Protein backbone atom coordinates (compact mmCIF):
# COMPACT_ATOMS: atom_id res chain seq x y z
CA UNK A 1 0.00 0.00 0.00
CA UNK A 2 1.23 3.54 -0.78
CA UNK A 3 1.99 6.19 1.77
CA UNK A 4 -0.12 8.84 0.04
CA UNK A 5 -2.77 8.53 2.72
CA UNK A 6 -4.93 5.69 1.64
CA UNK A 7 -7.69 5.17 4.03
CA UNK A 8 -8.32 2.08 6.07
CA UNK A 9 -9.53 -0.72 3.90
CA UNK A 10 -12.46 -1.40 6.09
CA UNK A 11 -13.62 2.20 5.93
CA UNK A 12 -13.26 2.31 2.19
CA UNK A 13 -15.14 -0.89 1.84
CA UNK A 14 -17.97 0.50 4.01
CA UNK A 15 -18.35 3.83 2.20
CA UNK A 16 -18.05 2.46 -1.31
CA UNK A 17 -21.14 0.29 -1.27
CA UNK A 18 -23.13 3.02 0.44
CA UNK A 19 -22.37 5.54 -2.29
CA UNK A 20 -23.03 3.09 -5.07
CA UNK A 21 -26.23 1.75 -3.60
CA UNK A 22 -27.51 5.27 -2.72
CA UNK A 23 -27.06 6.38 -6.33
CA UNK A 24 -28.90 3.30 -7.55
CA UNK A 25 -31.76 3.94 -5.10
CA UNK A 26 -32.14 7.56 -6.21
CA UNK A 27 -32.19 6.55 -9.88
CA UNK A 28 -34.74 3.82 -9.23
CA UNK A 29 -36.93 6.18 -7.17
CA UNK A 30 -37.00 8.79 -9.92
CA UNK A 31 -38.00 6.16 -12.44
CA UNK A 32 -40.79 4.90 -10.23
CA UNK A 33 -42.18 8.41 -9.72
CA UNK A 34 -42.40 9.02 -13.44
CA UNK A 35 -43.86 5.73 -14.60
CA UNK A 36 -45.48 4.27 -11.49
CA UNK A 37 -48.20 6.87 -10.92
CA UNK A 38 -50.25 5.50 -13.81
CA UNK A 39 -51.14 2.27 -11.95
CA UNK A 40 -53.79 2.06 -9.23
CA UNK A 41 -51.47 0.56 -6.60
CA UNK A 42 -48.33 2.46 -7.48
CA UNK A 43 -48.13 4.18 -4.06
CA UNK A 44 -48.40 0.90 -2.16
CA UNK A 45 -45.59 -0.93 -3.99
CA UNK A 46 -42.07 -0.55 -2.53
CA UNK A 47 -39.27 -0.57 -5.15
CA UNK A 48 -36.83 -3.40 -4.92
CA UNK A 49 -33.84 -1.08 -5.35
CA UNK A 50 -34.79 0.91 -2.26
CA UNK A 51 -34.98 -2.19 -0.15
CA UNK A 52 -31.65 -3.39 -1.44
CA UNK A 53 -30.04 0.02 -0.98
CA UNK A 54 -31.18 0.26 2.61
CA UNK A 55 -30.27 -3.30 3.50
CA UNK A 56 -26.62 -2.74 2.68
CA UNK A 57 -25.75 -0.01 5.15
CA UNK A 58 -27.69 -1.55 8.00
CA UNK A 59 -24.80 -3.89 8.61
CA UNK A 60 -22.26 -1.09 9.00
CA UNK A 61 -24.33 1.58 10.77
CA UNK A 62 -25.30 1.69 14.39
CA UNK A 63 -28.41 0.24 15.88
CA UNK A 64 -30.36 3.54 15.87
CA UNK A 65 -29.52 4.39 12.28
CA UNK A 66 -30.42 0.87 11.21
CA UNK A 67 -33.84 1.05 12.86
CA UNK A 68 -34.60 4.39 11.18
CA UNK A 69 -33.60 3.04 7.79
CA UNK A 70 -35.75 -0.08 8.28
CA UNK A 71 -38.76 2.10 9.19
CA UNK A 72 -38.32 4.21 6.07
CA UNK A 73 -38.06 1.07 3.95
CA UNK A 74 -41.27 -0.39 5.41
CA UNK A 75 -43.35 2.77 4.79
CA UNK A 76 -44.43 3.26 1.13
CA UNK A 77 -43.80 6.60 -0.55
CA UNK A 78 -47.39 7.33 -1.58
CA UNK A 79 -48.97 6.90 1.92
CA UNK A 80 -48.36 6.53 5.65
CA UNK A 81 -48.82 3.97 8.40
CA UNK A 82 -51.96 5.69 9.70
CA UNK A 83 -53.62 5.47 6.27
CA UNK A 84 -52.86 1.75 6.12
CA UNK A 85 -54.40 1.23 9.55
CA UNK A 86 -57.56 3.12 8.48
CA UNK A 87 -58.16 0.91 5.46
CA UNK A 88 -59.17 -2.11 7.53
CA UNK A 89 -61.79 -0.45 9.81
CA UNK A 90 -63.33 1.45 6.88
CA UNK A 91 -64.04 -1.77 5.03
CA UNK A 92 -65.49 -3.34 8.18
CA UNK A 93 -67.82 -0.35 8.73
CA UNK A 94 -69.04 -0.53 5.14
CA UNK A 95 -69.82 -4.22 5.55
CA UNK A 96 -71.74 -3.54 8.79
CA UNK A 97 -73.78 -0.76 7.15
CA UNK A 98 -74.67 -3.03 4.24
CA UNK A 99 -75.76 -5.74 6.69
CA UNK A 100 -77.95 -3.29 8.65
CA UNK A 101 -79.59 -2.02 5.46
CA UNK A 102 -80.36 -5.58 4.42
CA UNK A 103 -81.89 -6.33 7.84
CA UNK A 104 -84.03 -3.16 7.72
CA UNK A 105 -85.23 -4.07 4.25
CA UNK A 106 -86.25 -7.52 5.48
CA UNK A 107 -88.21 -5.96 8.37
CA UNK A 108 -89.98 -3.55 6.04
CA UNK A 109 -90.97 -6.41 3.75
CA UNK A 110 -92.36 -8.40 6.69
CA UNK A 111 -94.34 -5.38 7.92
CA UNK A 112 -95.89 -4.91 4.49
CA UNK A 113 -96.84 -8.55 4.19
CA UNK A 114 -98.26 -8.89 7.72
CA UNK A 115 -99.64 -5.47 8.84
CA UNK A 116 -102.01 -6.96 11.50
CA UNK A 117 -99.33 -8.81 13.43
CA UNK A 118 -98.98 -5.97 15.97
CA UNK A 119 -102.75 -5.69 16.44
CA UNK A 120 -102.92 -9.40 17.21
CA UNK A 121 -100.55 -9.02 20.15
CA UNK A 122 -102.38 -5.91 21.40
CA UNK A 123 -105.70 -7.79 21.46
CA UNK A 124 -104.15 -10.67 23.34
CA UNK A 125 -102.73 -8.32 25.97
CA UNK A 126 -106.09 -6.58 26.38
CA UNK A 127 -107.98 -9.86 26.83
CA UNK A 128 -105.41 -11.03 29.34
CA UNK A 129 -105.71 -7.84 31.38
CA UNK A 130 -109.54 -8.05 31.36
CA UNK A 131 -109.50 -11.65 32.56
CA UNK A 132 -107.01 -10.73 35.26
CA UNK A 133 -109.23 -7.91 36.50
CA UNK A 134 -112.36 -10.06 36.51
CA UNK A 135 -110.66 -12.84 38.43
CA UNK A 136 -109.30 -10.46 41.09
CA UNK A 137 -112.35 -8.19 41.33
CA UNK A 138 -113.89 -8.76 44.77
CA UNK A 139 -116.64 -6.11 44.75
CA UNK A 140 -118.93 -7.58 42.08
CA UNK A 141 -122.58 -7.39 43.16
CA UNK A 142 -124.44 -10.71 42.95
CA UNK A 143 -128.22 -10.76 43.18
CA UNK A 144 -129.66 -12.58 46.18
CA UNK A 145 -133.02 -14.22 45.60
CA UNK A 146 -134.20 -13.81 49.18
CA UNK A 147 -133.49 -10.08 49.21
CA UNK A 148 -135.17 -9.63 45.84
CA UNK A 149 -138.30 -11.39 47.09
CA UNK A 150 -138.41 -9.19 50.16
CA UNK A 151 -138.04 -6.05 48.11
CA UNK A 152 -140.80 -7.08 45.69
CA UNK A 153 -143.91 -6.77 47.83
CA UNK A 154 -146.91 -4.53 48.55
CA UNK A 155 -146.44 -0.80 48.48
CA UNK A 156 -147.25 -0.69 52.18
CA UNK A 157 -143.69 -1.80 52.99
CA UNK A 158 -142.26 1.18 51.15
CA UNK A 159 -144.76 3.51 52.80
CA UNK A 160 -143.75 2.26 56.23
CA UNK A 161 -140.19 3.39 55.62
CA UNK A 162 -141.31 6.87 54.69
CA UNK A 163 -143.97 7.08 57.40
CA UNK A 164 -141.44 6.95 60.25
CA UNK A 165 -139.60 10.04 59.01
CA UNK A 166 -140.42 13.28 60.84
CA UNK A 167 -142.29 15.83 58.71
CA UNK A 168 -140.38 18.86 57.54
CA UNK A 169 -142.60 21.83 58.20
CA UNK A 170 -142.54 24.92 56.08
CA UNK A 171 -142.00 27.35 58.99
CA UNK A 172 -138.86 25.50 60.04
CA UNK A 173 -137.45 25.45 56.54
CA UNK A 174 -138.24 29.09 55.90
CA UNK A 175 -137.15 30.12 59.39
CA UNK A 176 -133.61 28.84 58.74
CA UNK A 177 -133.34 31.07 55.69
CA UNK A 178 -134.96 34.01 57.48
CA UNK A 179 -132.48 33.81 60.34
CA UNK A 180 -129.67 34.42 57.86
CA UNK A 181 -131.44 37.51 56.53
CA UNK A 182 -132.48 39.71 59.39
CA UNK A 183 -135.47 41.82 58.45
CA UNK A 184 -136.23 40.42 54.95
CA UNK A 185 -138.12 37.14 55.43
CA UNK A 186 -140.67 38.11 58.09
CA UNK A 187 -143.54 38.15 55.62
CA UNK A 188 -142.67 34.68 54.35
CA UNK A 189 -142.51 33.30 57.88
CA UNK A 190 -145.94 34.69 58.70
CA UNK A 191 -147.43 33.22 55.54
CA UNK A 192 -145.85 29.83 56.25
CA UNK A 193 -147.17 29.88 59.81
CA UNK A 194 -150.70 30.41 58.51
CA UNK A 195 -150.48 27.25 56.36
CA UNK A 196 -151.96 24.23 58.19
CA UNK A 197 -149.56 21.46 59.05
CA UNK A 198 -149.99 18.25 57.02
CA UNK A 199 -151.32 15.31 58.94
CA UNK A 200 -148.86 12.44 58.69
CA UNK A 201 -150.07 9.07 60.05
CA UNK A 202 -147.66 7.26 62.31
CA UNK A 203 -148.72 3.66 61.69
CA UNK A 204 -150.10 1.53 58.93
CA UNK A 205 -153.25 0.90 60.96
CA UNK A 206 -154.16 4.56 60.81
CA UNK A 207 -153.45 4.63 57.09
CA UNK A 208 -155.79 1.68 56.59
CA UNK A 209 -158.52 3.30 58.70
CA UNK A 210 -158.51 6.56 56.78
CA UNK A 211 -160.00 5.20 53.53
CA UNK A 212 -162.71 3.33 55.49
CA UNK A 213 -163.63 6.45 57.44
CA UNK A 214 -163.71 8.53 54.28
CA UNK A 215 -166.04 6.02 52.61
CA UNK A 216 -168.38 6.05 55.63
CA UNK A 217 -168.47 9.84 55.66
CA UNK A 218 -169.29 9.94 51.96
CA UNK A 219 -172.19 7.53 52.46
CA UNK A 220 -173.59 9.61 55.30
CA UNK A 221 -173.35 12.79 53.27
CA UNK A 222 -175.14 11.14 50.33
CA UNK A 223 -177.98 9.92 52.56
CA UNK A 224 -178.33 13.37 54.08
CA UNK A 225 -178.63 14.95 50.64
CA UNK A 226 -181.19 12.39 49.41
CA UNK A 227 -183.65 12.95 52.32
CA UNK A 228 -184.38 16.67 51.62
CA UNK A 229 -184.81 15.90 47.92
CA UNK A 230 -187.57 13.40 48.75
CA UNK A 231 -189.36 15.84 51.06
CA UNK A 232 -189.47 18.73 48.56
CA UNK A 233 -192.13 17.27 46.14
CA UNK A 234 -194.50 16.55 49.07
CA UNK A 235 -194.29 20.02 50.53
CA UNK A 236 -194.30 22.02 47.33
CA UNK A 237 -197.27 21.53 44.92
CA UNK A 238 -197.34 23.15 41.51
CA UNK A 239 -199.93 25.86 40.97
CA UNK A 240 -202.73 25.60 38.41
CA UNK A 241 -201.36 28.37 36.29
CA UNK A 242 -197.89 26.79 36.07
CA UNK A 243 -199.48 23.45 35.08
CA UNK A 244 -201.71 24.94 32.37
CA UNK A 245 -199.10 27.22 30.87
CA UNK A 246 -197.12 24.51 29.05
CA UNK A 247 -200.35 22.93 27.72
CA UNK A 248 -201.41 26.22 26.16
CA UNK A 249 -198.02 26.60 24.58
CA UNK A 250 -198.23 23.12 23.08
CA UNK A 251 -201.72 23.78 21.73
CA UNK A 252 -200.92 27.11 20.10
CA UNK A 253 -197.92 25.80 18.20
CA UNK A 254 -199.85 23.49 15.78
CA UNK A 255 -202.34 26.22 15.02
CA UNK A 256 -199.53 28.54 14.03
CA UNK A 257 -198.05 25.87 11.80
CA UNK A 258 -201.42 25.41 10.00
CA UNK A 259 -201.81 29.12 9.39
CA UNK A 260 -198.35 29.37 7.94
CA UNK A 261 -199.03 26.42 5.64
CA UNK A 262 -202.28 27.99 4.40
CA UNK A 263 -200.60 31.32 3.72
CA UNK A 264 -197.88 29.59 1.72
CA UNK A 265 -200.47 27.70 -0.35
CA UNK A 266 -202.43 30.91 -1.08
CA UNK A 267 -199.26 32.64 -2.28
CA UNK A 268 -198.45 29.77 -4.62
CA UNK A 269 -201.94 29.92 -6.14
CA UNK A 270 -201.60 33.66 -6.72
CA UNK A 271 -198.28 33.17 -8.46
CA UNK A 272 -199.75 30.48 -10.69
CA UNK A 273 -202.67 32.77 -11.67
CA UNK A 274 -200.25 35.55 -12.53
CA UNK A 275 -198.26 33.23 -14.74
CA UNK A 276 -201.43 32.09 -16.56
CA UNK A 277 -202.53 35.69 -17.14
CA UNK A 278 -199.13 36.51 -18.59
CA UNK A 279 -199.28 33.52 -20.96
CA UNK A 280 -202.79 34.50 -22.12
CA UNK A 281 -201.63 38.02 -22.86
CA UNK A 282 -198.75 36.69 -24.92
CA UNK A 283 -201.07 34.45 -26.93
CA UNK A 284 -203.53 37.27 -27.56
CA UNK A 285 -200.76 39.54 -28.77
CA UNK A 286 -199.55 36.89 -31.21
CA UNK A 287 -203.08 36.31 -32.53
CA UNK A 288 -203.59 40.00 -33.31
Curated annotation (Swiss-Prot):
It comes from the Eukaryota. Strongly expressed in testis, low expression in placenta, and very low expression in brain. Residues 1-102, 207-288 are annotated as: Disordered. Residues 81-100, 223-235, 257-270 have a biased composition (Acidic residues). InterPro entries: CT47 (IPR028930). Residues 259-287 form a coiled coil. Residues 20-31, 45-60, 236-247 have a biased composition (Low complexity). Residues 1-10, 207-222, 271-282 have a biased composition (Basic and acidic residues). Keywords: Coiled coil. This is Cancer/testis antigen 47A. It comes from Homo sapiens (Human).
